[in-house]
Amino acid sequence: MRTALLLLAALAVATGPALTLRCHVCTSSSNCKHSVVCPASSRFCKTTNTVEPLRGNLVKKDCAESCTPSYTLQGQVSSGTSSTQCCQEDLCNEKLHNAAPTRTALAHSALSLGLALSLLAVILAPSL
């Protein structure tokens, strides 16, 4: 009995705790300091950042079973962007896209609006 207990204790020490990933989880750039222990099936911390001209910077951070890094530049009129970043270390997604580039998004919106109004004026202006 004593030998079985010693063997069980040695086995528990040798195997150690299960390896789980810790990631920051949030749905906006203002509250991205919340960290969680991910489910055992999650191998990645994933950060998705979408910049839309009228809505600004939309950030989503979470645990993910799979993750494919990407960068997408949307059409010239919307001039939005979307990116996904992946990492595999504890709390590695802390600083990924936390800064909200709202000034840039607003500048793009103003430029798009100016171009649209100029085009409209040219189309609707009477011939000179």
From Swiss-Prot:
Lipid attachment locations (GPI-anchor amidated asparagine): N98
GO CC, any one term: membrane
Keywords in alphabetical order: Cell adhesion, Cell membrane, Disulfide bond, Glycoprotein, GPI-anchor, Lipoprotein, Membrane, Signal
Disulfide cysteine pairs (residue numbers): C23-C45, C26-C32, C38-C63, C67-C86, C87-C92
GO BP, one annotated term: response to stilbenoid
Top-rank taxon, per record: Eukaryota
UniProt propeptide residues: 99-128
Transmembrane portions of the chain: none
Tissue expression per record: Expressed exclusively at the outer cell surface of transitional epithelia and the keratinocyte of stratified squamous epithelia.
Topological type in the membrane: Lipid-anchor; GPI-anchor
Annotated localization: Cell membrane
Signal peptide boundaries: 1-20
Domain UPAR/Ly6, first and last residues per copy: 21-108
InterPro entries to which the protein is assigned, alphabetical: CD59_antigen_CS, LY6_UPA_recep-like, Ly6D, Snake_toxin-like_sf, Toxin/TOLIP
Function statement: May act as a specification marker at earliest stage specification of lymphocytes between B- and T-cell development. Marks the earliest stage of B-cell specification.
Entry protein name: Lymphocyte antigen 6D
Organism encoding this protein: Homo sapiens (Human)
Native organism taxonomy: Eukaryota, Metazoa, Chordata, Craniata, Vertebrata
